[in-house]
């Protein structure tokens, strides 16, 4: 059985492909058949839009329209309990896993022999020609395919009947970690193949983090006081090994596919339609909607491959993905089979690697930077050195544990590594010229508060008493995605602190025009403007207030989810970790991070100080209470409200609302056109099924109104 191109992807048949309407009628107005048909149209259209965006770089619709289509599909699937196995909505992540299982590969994922010298590549060519001659092939006809050697994480991805079914890391080459749910969240990995793929297809790809996205993500990590990734490869590898797929979904991973590992057209495993050459396999990738690199070439001799490598190396800084060389592979599959492989590597491929971008220099000093959350980052001050055409005078040492592992100190000769947007760092001490290892300070270099170790990291315990942390906190409060206060950039924040006008976050709201106008570089107009900006933030939306506090792991998206779930600040301040975990986008780690921040006495003083000065966030209209405490509800079908509103309503009164029926469920509330699977689960578990009228009666008995009052 093969999979044909989705019929709904044709713009003539699918209204959501070109100029799609987004003024949808209420979900509750649809029958189950109508919802199923609309969801099918939306899935096909979203896949088409993903293909146009990620593979063709030619989007048909703006991001805002795409988001509306995606949200509508989520609503339909939730309200009507529609199957979502390979729906685009699965990309937002699923339930956290207990561990990564180990799975065997369809075919060995071998490594590739490599070298940085051209002569070694020519020797490889000689072995290929000799081997082909010995097997009776015409070695003069050999052609090579040249492609980038990606510096990411290699994965095997399997499709059956065109549907995505599994993904695994390379592991030891024979078996790897099952990362099916993690890879599913990568937008450029199709959940359903286009065209006419074989009944079973296994492909090899390289998951990576684009360089621009890596830079932005690292900046966000450092802004939150978290350890940045050393390089894009570490970012990709660390992300795919996350047990929580929702964490993976939040990180900007991408993928290139570059090889076919298995191709089966029927139960006997015959493969008459598999391309005869690697070059032709690239055409099938395009036909199936599998993203591949464009910088590939086919050459008829090894000198052409060497020339390709030199040209690609010259352009590497302009690429938005990290590469560390090129792969040169025999094109013809029959030739490949004749050449075979060793236990470790194929005889028909070779990697011509780029020289490393490193240099050696002397550490002239070590300074310690203080981040917004108090994280202390040691930095090596260097004798300036040219590394790959860029003068480097500073390099990160990451954290105290890294210093201890390196054994580095002032005066040592160290190697510096730099690549693209990667922060220059010290991978090794080349020559030890000092005695001992740098001793990390026990007090903050800025405020002298004690330093506290947390695993490999170190933190200043001074909180907002620390001038550095205070300045970063004020800057964060004023950010566009928080309170959006114009006129509070780093230089002005430092000036206000040094003038003694701002010694805590609440002090911002004690500022007066006369105080500001007297400062150097200020005038009455600029002072009045800042005071007006501050006054406009005294009744901020709850989510902006939360985002502005700078709670680790809580950005704008999570702040909105918290605000929508709890409704007011006091409810959030009182919520324990279990209550926090019930919020969309909040997993165990984020819940712990929120609770730790809110339990900090200095942070509570700052929050109370803001409220005392009239900065009190607007509450979201959500009722609270414990009338339903101890009950667990599951909703299915169409109700008089959306399912999300129903869940939020019962949770606001102390109940739990889950997405699936289990032995812990007290009631399955079935609206119109309920999902069959949940009703079957309820029957199997002995869970009572009630309609909306009965549900309203249950709530009324406990003093809770239904539907929720406006």
From Swiss-Prot:
Q: What EC number(s) is this enzyme filed under?
A: 6.5.1.2
Q: What is the recorded function of this protein according to its Swiss-Prot or TrEMBL entry?
A: DNA ligase that catalyzes the formation of phosphodiester linkages between 5'-phosphoryl and 3'-hydroxyl groups in double-stranded DNA using NAD as a coenzyme and as the energy source for the reaction. It is essential for DNA replication and repair of damaged DNA.
One molecular function GO term is:
metal ion binding
Q: Which organism's genome codes for this protein? A: Halorubrum lacusprofundi (strain ATCC 49239 / DSM 5036 / JCM 8891 / ACAM 34)
Q: From its record, what is one biological process in GO terms?
A: DNA repair
Question: What keywords does the record list, in alphabetical order?
Answer: DNA damage, DNA repair, DNA replication, Ligase, Magnesium, Manganese, Metal-binding, NAD, Zinc
Quote the InterPro entries the UniProt record gives: BRCT_dom, BRCT_dom_sf, DisA/LigA_HHH, DNA_ligase, DNA_ligase_CS, DNAligase_adenylation, DNAligase_N, Hlx-hairpin-Hlx_DNA-bd_motif
What are the BRCT domain coordinates in residue numbering?
Answer: 623-710
What is the designated name of this protein? DNA ligase
Required co-factor?
A: Mg(2+); Mn(2+)
Please give the residue ranges the record annotates as the region Disordered.
1-36, 657-689
Q: Which NCBIfam families match?
A: dnlj, PRK07956.1, PRK14351.1
Spell out the SMART domains in the cross-references.
BRCT (SM00292), HhH1 (SM00278), LIGANc (SM00532)
Recorded hits in Gene3D superfamilies, A to Z, give: 5' to 3' exonuclease, C-terminal subdomain, 6.20.10.30, BRCT domain, DNA ligase/mRNA capping enzyme, Helix hairpin bin, Nucleic acid-binding proteins
Q: Known catalysed reaction(s)? A: NAD(+) + (deoxyribonucleotide)n-3'-hydroxyl + 5'-phospho-(deoxyribonucleotide)m = (deoxyribonucleotide)n+m + AMP + beta-nicotinamide D-nucleotide
Q: State the similarity comment.
A: Belongs to the NAD-dependent DNA ligase family. LigA subfamily.
Which amino acid positions bind NAD(+), per UniProt? 63-67, 111-112, 147, 170, 206, 353
Q: Which class of enzymes does this protein belong to?
A: ligase
Which residues does the annotation say bind Zn(2+)?
A: 444, 447, 460, 466
